[in-house]
Amino acid sequence: MAEPDYIEDDNPELIRPQKLINPVKTSRNHQDLHRELLMNQKRGLAPQNKPELQKVMEKRKRDQVIKQKEEEAQKKKSDLEIELLKRQQKLEQLELEKQKLQEEQENAPEFVKVKGNLRRTGQEVAQAQES
């Protein structure tokens, strides 16, 4: 590395830079605290560890706040969202009814199916003759 010019020159008019003193590192309290933290780390003790009960209580509180926010968001639904939900529920009910009817028809005995087909064909023939 290149050395600065002021090292070679013995010019008394120049102000030579000095290394700044870090007041935090020179303080006795900081040194003691640093030494204590190093010792605790070697032992495996972490200063930020909280008691288990406190952790559980904080987690419950966070969960409760999240649930409250979700409930408030659901309560603040707009009229459009409410109408869409109603329509969706109606469509689901209609689909369930259709499925029930199909299951009933599939589970019905064969003679009931044939009888229904005969009635329909009889009605269709009657309508065709009237037209």
From Swiss-Prot:
Modified residues (N6-acetyllysine): K50
Coiled coil spans: 61-112
UniProt keyword list: Acetylation, Coiled coil
Residue numbers carrying N-acetylalanine: A2
InterPro entries linked: FAM107
Entry's family note: Belongs to the FAM107 family.
Protein name: Protein FAM107B
Organism: Homo sapiens (Human)
The gene coding this protein: FAM107B
